[in-house]
Amino acid sequence: MTRTVRPTGVENFLGEEELIVSKTDLKGRITYANDVFIRMAKYTYAELMGAPHSLIRHPDMPRAVFKLLWDTLQAKQEIFAYVVNLAKDGSHYWVFAHVTPTFDERGNIVGYHSNRRKPDSVQIERIKPIYKTLCAEEARHANAKDGMHASFDAMVGLLKQQGVGYDEFVLSL
């Protein structure tokens, strides 16, 4: 699905008790979306099914975070992350995501499962400048892959500087 959605700056918010749930196949194509996901993303169920989960990627979201996410999932580990998503109408919404691999009976990864909740606004205000710095690093490079790797290195450097791992950092915000 090709899209040219431009961010409008309008922010939408999940309810305190709402939970976005989605499942994807091994390539990140959506195989399940609950009603909250459909409402927040503003796509129909039919539009979401089979579409890459990156359909809702906001341009202010550093690619380095997604590299870490995919690296972690491929290592058969879960990951928590703050993510800003872009809805079909250009509005956006922040989530605190918990993403896990789904395994078959032999321990092989067969897909991915994500639960997303409303994050605390204080945590979002803490992560925004970090994401802005990482996106700026990505933008300094003509080649997107080079930018992602430079941003990833900057993120790793920040974590080393603070003496924490990614999980500890995210859960301490």
List the predicted regions and their residue ranges:
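Sensory/regulatory domains in signal-transduction proteins
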Residues: 2-134
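Juxtadomain coupling helices with adjacent low-complexity linkers
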Residues: 110-113, 117-173
